[in-house]
């Protein structure tokens, strides 16, 4: 099911294509699968953004061509100013065609967080496309002039639609995406409360960062 969400956002809404440069905001289960779908469809670069080092390390090993950890706002700096500064730092660090094209072709936000949406807006090339997947606050501020002047397309993506499950099954069955890798913690049904606690805390009893927690029957595997 999460893979179908990623396929719908990346393929149906984002219309990802080969050799594009793709920015993914958020390295949770959906963000990671979005990045994996982009790679499977031939994206040249897939850059994952997150604040958690362990998630970025996982993204690098799973699907990302590179990762980026944005800095927090400086004193008296607004979220949008911080996002602009981070976007410039990201483009400078990547160089190559991303900088030459003045931004990414496609950005997909899996967080719903205002700073991430703003970062996407500042990191887009002219006539790029942003797909919003994550649900955060019902209202956020975006640099609308930046989007208008650059004619950036902004689309929403909600769950999945006809054909997305078929595409997801094909990607998994052909070995193009190993969905089992994002399941970092497994719990038996009798330990369901521990599973929810780990999800809430973001870490399991073993101290590792949780990407995807699974509750299953039978013996649990760490």
Where are these regions (language model features)?
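Local beta-strand N-terminus motif with an aromatic residue
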Residues: 19, 64, 103-104, 192
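Mid-domain Rossmann-like dinucleotide-binding core that forms the NAD(H)/NADP(H) cofactor-binding site
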Residues: 1-77
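Short conserved AdoMet
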Residues: 17, 112, 125, 204
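Short glycine/serine/threonine-rich phosphate/pyrophosphate-binding segments
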Residues: 29-34, 113-119
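Short amphipathic alpha-helix with an adjacent loop that forms part of the alpha/beta core around
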Residues: 73-101
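Glycine-rich phosphate-binding loop and adjacent beta-alpha segment
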Residues: 69, 114-174, 181, 214-222
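C-terminal capping/lid region of NAD(P)-dependent oxidoreductase domains
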Residues: 97, 101, 136, 177-182, ...
